[in-house]
Amino acid sequence: MATYKEIKGFNIKSLSTDPSTPLEGEIWFNSTSGTLKVAPLVVPVWASGGTNPYTAYDACGFGTPTAAVICCGNSPPQIDTANEYNGTSFSPTTAYPSPQSGADGDGPQTAGLVAGGYSGGYLTLNCDYNGTAWSVNPVMNAARSGLGLLGNTAAQTAAIAVSGEGPSAPVTTSTSDYDGSSWTAGAAVPTWKQGTSAGGTTSAGIAMGGTAPIATNSLIYNGSSWSAGPTMNSPHQSAGGGGLATAAVCFGGTTAGSNAATEDYDGSSWGSAGNMATAVSNCHGKATIDGPTAFVATGSDGSAPARTDVSQVRGGFLVETQTVTTS
């Protein structure tokens, strides 16, 4: 015969004080106050991140919401300016080796990689950042702009540049693999994507959005080949995004004007996740290695001139521990 515990589940823990690091949704009885409590939930929300030192669109960036680098972009003209962000304010750092726009970046603030872009022509330039200065790497095997770059924390030694556009064709389905010393041709993506975003690692990656042919699609990488991924809920052309293949975020872009929609990916499907504080497109000036948290600075907000110095942070909003009542 089944026991009561087998039928009804485990007993609720009785604790004299609330746990300091409870699991989301955890329930316990506080014996001191005589109350039943449930642990807080962390809900990612967007908030203002302050004013970026310069206005631009098609900038690039990498890092986290509390330790980021935002650099370059079309101001116009194209610029080489770079700034660090500490979660509160910006400070200048060493300029990027060449003015450009349309590149993408990935990695932590002290070990980031920026690749590609456009400056009077499509670029094979790619550079490492060590937290203080830039170093130029061997050129990419293919010039591209409007690409997505993935690699996460290992970007300087294991990265993939995804799709974009280049000099040989308006758009490309090619990718480029980087091992820390050289770039080689990688597995082609099923559909070309200009202005795409990417996240994850070279063994488990994701690309999302882009200008065409379908701005709602995503692509999944398994370490050797790309395949069609789940469809997003709204189009994200020239959007921002990144994270991991099991915890990604995509935000902003162009949909008959600048888009504020945000979506989270959990490894199986995309879910609508509220709106940005300010709608922006052309927003690769972002820091997303800890997706679904994110930081984005600059972009196009649809105003004239079509560029902005706004920055936005998407972090965890802590819902306080709640007392369970009958009301």
Label for each model-derived stretch:
Residues 1-327:
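Polar, enzyme-active/binding microenvironments
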